[in-house]
Regions:
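Structural motif
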Residues: 26-28, 95-102, 145-152, 226-230
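Acidic carboxylate motifs that coordinate Ca2+ or other divalent cations, activating on Asp/Glu
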Residues: 81
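A low-complexity, Ser/Thr/Gly/Pro-enriched, surface-exposed linker/loop concept
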Residues: 48-60, 229-257
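Hydrophobic beta-strand segments that make up the repeating blades of beta-propeller
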Residues: 86-90
Length: 258
């Protein structure tokens, strides 16, 4: 079945084909047309498209980032040149089976496929978000419940350029690692902060004492009654050393037995 997508532009309209409308998703294609000339401007094949009707119609420009409903066609200015571009869904190929898009930038000669912008809509979690006021594009990617990365980009020479990223990593609970990277005008500068959450539900018991001479705390703790760990924190509460560094569910170097 083929549906027309309209109402998002005075210049353009879209068409989308679903091979099977009895399913929530199916393969198909998405096309963009010039309203005056009826010329087909963009065609994108998709291995999977979401079939969401609103009052019997398909709507454009719905983007519930990162995992909510997404239209198969988005029409927005992505490179901040004052001209609206197109994001066309080509499946659910982003992280955790999230929607993925191909990006076509407006030019003097029509719409041109952008590999660099498309990667931002393929390799992360869903479609990227756009802050028009500050001219920033943002992406998010994750691995399970305990690792997330948030990145910001500006646009230079019609290409996205990474200017900052923030990563939080709690995969080795109760050790938490925060990593920030910022562009200083010449290079990316990385800052890493490591802390310990003694209130973690995984810590069954801990013992802490202070060493005045070096102004540091020594912490011994037990995770899930499996192993004895220790950590050294400085006067700012940052972890300078912890041992062992492996997950508590890997083979321990030594055991703690009451």
């Amino acid at each position: 079945a083929t549906f027309k997508i309209d109402g998002f532009s005075k210049q353009y309209y879209g068409k989308v084909y679903f091979s099977d409308t009895t399913e929530i998703t199916s393969d198909g294609w998405v096309e963009v047309y010039d309203r005056v000339t009826e010329k087909k401007l963009i065609h994108v094949d998709a291995d999977e498209l979401s079939f969401n009707l609103h009052d019997g119609e398909l709507k454009a420009h719905i983007a519930e980032i990162p995992y909510g409903e997404h239209s198969v066609l988005l029409h927005e200015d992505y490179n901040f040149d004052g001209k609206k571009d197109f994001a066309i869904m080509d499946g659910f190929n982003s992280c955790y089976h999230g929607p993925s898009f191909q990006i076509y930038l407006a030019s003097k000669n029509g719409f041109v496929y952008s590999d660099s912008f498309t990667r931002l809509a393929q390799d992360y979690c869903g479609m990227f978000s756009v802050d028009h006021e500050n001219e920033i594009i943002s992406t998010m990617v994750k691995s399970g419940c305990c690792w997330h990365q948030f990145s910001n980009y500006i646009v230079e020479n019609n290409e996205p350029k990474l200017v900052s990223s923030y990563t939080d990593d709690s995969q080795n609970d109760p050790i938490y690692i925060e990593r920030t990277e910022e562009w200083d005008g010449k290079k990316m500068v990385e800052t890493v902060s490591t802390s310990i959450e003694l209130e973690s539900e995984n810590i069954k018991e801990y013992f802490k004492f202070h060493v005045d001479k070096v102004n540091k705390d020594i912490i011994l703790y037990n995770i899930n009654d499996r192993m004895l760990y220790y950590a050294i924190t400085n006067d700012k509460g940052n972890v300078e050393l912890y041992y062992p560094v492996d997950s508590p569910y890997q083979s321990p170097d030594f055991k703690y037995d009451k």
